[in-house]
Curated annotation (Swiss-Prot):
Keywords: Disulfide bond, FAD, Flavoprotein, Heme, Iron, Metal-binding, Molybdenum, NAD, Nitrate assimilation, Oxidoreductase. Residues 652-764 form the FAD-binding FR-type domain. Regulated by the nitrogen source and controlled by the circadian rhythm. Belongs to the nitrate reductase family. Homodimer. This is Nitrate reductase [NADH].
Amino acid sequence: MAASVENRQFSHLEPGLSGVVRSFKPRSDSPVRGCNFPLNNELTNFQKKPNTTIYLDCSSSEDDDDDDDKNEYLQMIRKGKLEVEPSVHDIRDEGTADNWIERNNSMIRLTGKHPFNSEPPLARLMHHGFITPVPLHYVRNHGPVPKGMWDDWTVEVTGLVKRPMKFTMEQLVNEFPSRELPVTLVCAGNRRKEQNMVKQTIGFNWGAAAVSTTVWRGVPLRAILKRCGIYSRTKGALNICFEGADVLPGGGGSKYGTSIKKEFAMDPSRDIIIAYMQNGEKLTPDHGFPLRMIIPGFIGGRMVKWLKRIIVTTQESESYYHYKDNRVLPPHVDAELANAEAWWYKPEYIINELNINSVITTPCHEEILPINSWTTQRPYTLRGYSYSGGGKKVTRVEVTMDGGETWNVCTVDHPEKPNKYGKYWCWCFWSLEVEVLDLLSAKEIAVRAWDETLNTQPEKLIWNVMGMMNNCWFRVKTNVCKPHKGEIGIVFEHPTQPGNLSGGWMAKERHLEISAEAPPTLKKSISTPFMNTASKMYSMSEVKKHNSADSAWIIVHGHVYDATRFLKDHPGGIDSILINAGTDCTEEFDAIHSDKAKKLLEDFRIGELITTGYTSDSSPNNSVHGSSSFSGFLAPIKELAPAVRSVALIPREKIPCKLVDKKSISHDVRKFRFALPSEDQVLGLPVGKHIFLCAIIDDKLCMRAYTPTSTVDEVGYFELVVKIYFKGIVPKFPNGGQMSQYLDSLPLGAFVDVKGPLGHIEYQGRGNFLVHGKRKFAKKLAMLAGGTGITPVYQVMQAILKDPEDETEMHVVYANRTEDDILLKDELDSWAVKLPERVKVWYVVQDSIKEGWKYSTGFITEAVLREHIPLPSQTTLALACGPPPMIQFAVNPNLEKMGYDIKDSLLVF
């Protein structure tokens, strides 16, 4: 008989200690108060319609499930529902395509606001034991959640089958046998942040809670394939491909898809189902409503959600995500090498079945165990979870407290029974009683597990570029602290905290390694008072005070940096730092900076961010907020700003803007119109400055700078003219432009985040500029642009021409590869015709493809500039924006040859 584990997960924790999870009770205002959760919605007990043909698959008949097991699972589901607060429309989803979905506020978001990738707090996950409440099940979404209707949804089965068919949800429920069983789902990236602390992978920071177990119900896949008459291997039926409804940016735009071998799909022992229920109810949107794959023992990445097509093929899936995701490449292969040498397409590196893994969950991170007469008289119980893949049973879990010299065998609890083929699809729980004095003398606690094939976990982490399948020993460090005056205690530290949350012993060790690798001159100064500040700890409230040009502090990966002395030297201008001053800008920093910039940042580190709730002489946090036993898990309530503002842009904040119009100007140029949050707002972008567009693309934050082409006083919207860099066009950039392709695939009604203003140049009208806070004046402007660099030049020209009293002359030299690449040509030519004395425009193209081209071909040369821009003078400024090689090899040297003082008279956007 299966045993419930909920009440045993934290039974030996010190009452009132930091991190202890108490029993949850329904909120007094909860709609579930007083209900007994019979789970009797329309799907709980399907009634087959009379006179309906049911295609039975006798060879894979369901096991004779023990009624006691079913009742126990039902009790767990009911208990979890009572303890979990209702899901709500999260304020963080406002302005995203997922704003219609209700979610649990305690989920830790790992990729910003959108898409929704999240895991529950580890302690809360373990509190619920064997069956995870659906709102707390980890979520892996590559993009917006598709909207689907139960009555309209169909799944198509096609390819190498005798009878291609489409099935409605009603047919799946009524015409096929169902299978219901608990299955543990695990993301292949579980524990990835540990790898990212060693060396950054291309994946985001999963903690140790990318694992959940629920009861799934659905149709056996093999029954569907048999009904459609799947062909034999000799006729080419080798792979089963799955395709979802979600349209994603990867590969220039594609649906999420993957495949498994036919042998897996048709194996009755594998219990593969097409699921439509989870914990007794219809699937929720985040978990694939109305239909998804469940492949027990496999990684989550093979279990396609929002399932629309099943294709029987000879080859594996051709989906971008089948090849560019869920691989474990050798440690020497980075992203660049993987792309250059096509490592993604080597079949030996694909991940299907999970590997053996285990985690310590008790003690939890930053838990404090006081050492006193009461605690030392009873043992402390270590606890955690373990799992393996392919249906293999976890047979042994061991704990060491001396670095692996000796191992203690733990008690292992398997709450599930194996299926009739002897396979285990769920996690198990382990525990070990230890003496408190032994904990006091230990420096760390480590765990490893073994499965029935005698596979075990490696001692050390093995890095790979995707950060997947990390299963090294899970280590918890111990340190002595003073929870109360006159007492000592043990504080426990897990290796990392999920997402961008700071904390964990790996972050501290990384800091020490960086300090040890510092140049000799830096090492020598460590003993000086200035360098001693690197060991100082700062609270978030202290950092927030340093948000101005007089003192600009930022937080990146838990480290505090004073960027004040770098403000004037920053290539992106002062605003690029000030817009993040006083905040944690880890995500933004990683999105736009190279490894070189990250190393440069170390020169400005002054200390670390305080992430713990204790100090050496302070008490642990034993408070309970109000009468709610689960308030500690609720997200902090943020005070909302007024709904209506005259200016949309808010420094240090991202604002959501909806795409309301998209026009094709040419085959690769689009004009996008984005609505501001309020109809009566203006964007609030000074002339000469730019904005960042932010989006999660291929699981990473992508930020790109754009200058609007609409005038600064447009009300309710702004416009961008964007050149789309498609993949496979430019050999140097085979994947094309990430953001431009993302925008091109963005549907009307979708949102992007906008941040700004940024930039160090501001045109204040009538020839007056403010550059790095210093004023400059010009009567004549030499305006040099390349490619999309025309947009800030165009913006300044717009402002000049809109003011009838602004008499500034503009001499534009605009370089492109071909005539077809010229942006805003009609507008520029129109101004030149209407105002020939004030606006002069000259084009330079590398290769002319049209007859009768009257402008220059080749590159910007000294001769071109001498003929088409004014000579240097006290009232002449040069403005330039374009690719770095153009500025370095064409603009700078040729202006100097003409006599320009490029340090004083050249403004580069």
